[in-house]
Design a protein with these regions (language model features):
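Aromatic-residue-lined binding/catalytic grooves and analogous aromatic/hydrophobic interfacial grooves
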Residues: 9-10, 200-238
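Hydrophobic-face positions in mid-chain alpha helices that act as interaction patches
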Residues: 221-350, 380-401, 412-414, 422-428, ...
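Conserved, well-structured interaction surfaces
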Residues: 66-134, 166, 183-186, 337-344, ...
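Membrane-proximal, proline-rich intrinsically disordered regions
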Residues: 9-54, 294-298, 384, 437-481
Length: 481
């Protein structure tokens, strides 16, 4: 594939330093690296595409929810949309690249070592998320021919540069290079508020996700163990069945994205309306999905977990769990209105646990996988008692619940079941759907004003988001439709 020109670069590159000589000391570089995180969140479109989005049939349709639910390409660049996320990721990448270039010019000194590590891991993360939304999921048999996304490693000094899509394999190779090199350089003592930066644990958590996508299960376990061994991870999980279950709506909302919460390994403050809008989306948690996801009959234990009591709203029109607090930030004190910002969790301890459990299961280490899940359940079953047999997950219960599939697969399904409950509204479910090739069906409800019946199988090209119009206009190859 030949070189192409990617428009839209000016939309993020003009926010970067016009003259890199301004980055003439470690403090300035460190400040720039802090902006190397996408400040747009993906949950609005990821949740809408997933099987977490039922049709309520009553609420107003909004573009960031409706278009992804019916798997139609979006051309707008507004709050919480795929095109906006694309731009935010490349803006973050540009910050990382400018910082890395400045570090090189300063001679790669010890004082810039941690910033270099953070920039490399942040660059890897932004590309990882892009390739999984805008390309096919990693498949060792096809990755060398599947279209990737432009992997940018150099800062742009002009508004428009030349880019190549390359292949998914190319992108994954470069992600792994940046990730492994960057992790070795990180220094947790460098940050005033570590939860907003790639600390070692946050980077290790990212590595568990990366290698889970690659199906390198030994690596998943290796990096998960660096975060916390199974025996030690329980104390770092969200205290749903002891504290959260007693919290009021706004107390829970404040706690969920709090930097002091041990479960929050990496947070980002994103320009987003999702926190104030998701409960009212027409395509979201309706009554049938509430029972499917959180009902007692939804899992091998035949128990409701603590989440169920924290589903607020009273009616499916606004069912929600208060995970996102919106803050309006004004650019000037004279402004009447501010821009909405929400703190989102990019990596949590719970994901590390789930990734390790899934890796154990895929390696045939059934007992260790089930032990991992029981550790999780000790913080999710209300009134948990380790001596109560009803509170203990066993292979027999799993097999009974999934009688038609082998134990390994049934353990994985059990993990995905609890993972779906844990991360509802956060976009994680879509990543599992594309990674594992799960089918998604979206149907209109009787009496609704739309008439949609879509079943999206694992090979349906609409599972891959289309590139922004600006990118296509300047020659990047479109994803098939």
């Amino acid at each position: 594939m030949g070189a192409v020109v990617l428009s839209g670069c000016d939309k993020f590159l003009d926010h970067q330093p016009d003259d890199r000589t301004d980055l003439d000391n470690p403090v300035k570089i460190k400040e720039l690296v802090a902006s190397a995180y996408p400040q747009v969140f993906y949950a609005a479109f990821a949740e809408s595409m997933s099987d977490n989005a039922g049709n309520k049939g009553t609420a107003e349709r909004v573009d960031e929810n409706f278009f992804p639910w019916k798997f139609e390409d979006q051309v707008k660049t507004e709050y919480d949309m795929p095109n906006t996320y694309w731009q935010a990721c490349y803006k973050a990448i540009a910050s990382a690249n400018h910082a890395l270039a400045a570090i090189e010019e300063l001679g790669n000194t010890e004082s810039t070592r941690a910033s270099k590590g953070e920039a490399l891991v942040a660059r890897a993360y932004a590309h990882f998320m892009l390739v999984n939304f805008f390309s096919k999921p990693y498949n060792a048999n096809t990755a060398s021919t599947d279209l990737g996304i432009p992997y940018e490693t150099k800062p742009e000094k002009i508004a428009v540069g030349e880019y190549k899509r390359g292949t998914v394999q190319d992108v994954y190779n470069q992600i792994e290079k940046d990730l492994t090199e960057g992790v070795a350089l990180l220094d947790n003592s460098s940050y005033a508020v570590p939860s907003y930066h790639f600390t070692r644990n946050a980077a290790y958590a990212f590595a568990t996700r990366f290698y889970l996508f690659k199906k390198n299960y030994e690596k998943v376990i290796e990096y998960a163990d660096l975060v916390a061994k199974t025996a030690a991870i329980a104390s770092t999980l969200r205290p749903w069945n002891t504290e959260y279950v007693n919290f009021s709506y706004y107390v829970l909302q404040n706690a969920y994205g709090n930097a002091a919460t041990p479960a929050n390994l990496l947070l980002v403050e994103a320009n987003s309306k999702y926190g104030q809008s998701y409960a009212g989306y027409n395509y979201g948690l309706n009554s049938s999905l509430l029972a499917e996801v959180y009902g007692a009959g939804s899992n091998p234990l035949n128990l409701q977990l603590s989440f169920r009591s924290k589903v607020f709203g009273g009616t499916e029109v606004v069912y929600n769990i208060p995970k996102f607090k919106t803050t309006d930030i004004k650019e000037s004190i004279s402004d009447n209105f501010g821009e909405p910002y929400v703190v989102y969790t990019l990596f949590a301890m719970e994901e590390v646990l789930f990734n390790r459990a899934e890796a154990y299961a895929n390696l045939g280490r059934d007992d260790e996988a089930i032990t991992e899940i029981n550790t999780y359940l000790s913080k999710r079953i209300t009134g948990y008692n380790p001596n109560n047999a009803a509170h203990k997950l066993t292979s027999a219960k799993i097999t009974s619940f999934y009688p038609a599939i082998p134990l390994k697969e049934s353990i994985v399904e059990t993990i995905l079941n609890f993972k779906r409950q844990e991360f509802l509204f956060e976009g994680m479910r879509w990543l599992d759907i594309i990674r594992l090739g799960k089918t998604v069906t979206h149907r209109s409800v009787a009496g609704s004003k739309d008439n949609i019946n879509i079943t999206l199988g694992p090979e349906d090209p609409r599972r891959v988001l289309q590139l922004p119009v600006e990118a296509l206009q300047f020659g990047l190859e479109a994803n098939p439709r």
